[in-house]
Amino acid sequence: MNIGIDIEEIKRFQKLLKDKNFIERVFSKDEIEYCSSKKKNAVQHFAVRFAGKEAVWKAINKSRKLVITDISFKNSVLGKPEVYIKGKKASYIDISFSHNKTTVVAVAVSTK
């Protein structure tokens, strides 16, 4: 079992999200659509997904060659975030997101 965690400041993402190239380099089309649809909290959603990518990378990259764009998230029908690696569901990885007004955190647990 491997664990990864990442914490990000939301303020930092307010600046980064002004750069469209950054968004397209880091997030999938589906992630951009999902986060952008959260008008009021879009920055939090982008930031927590970035933290999630970092947490997943830390949990599994010891044995795999991955880049940040290989990792993405989709919500299940129940709203739980699920991890996808290179477009395929990674059921061996659990992810948890949380955020407040200033900070986001993500924790990933891999059983592989």
Residue ranges and their predicted role:
Residues 1-112:
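Core catalytic alpha/beta fold that binds nucleotide/phospho-ligands
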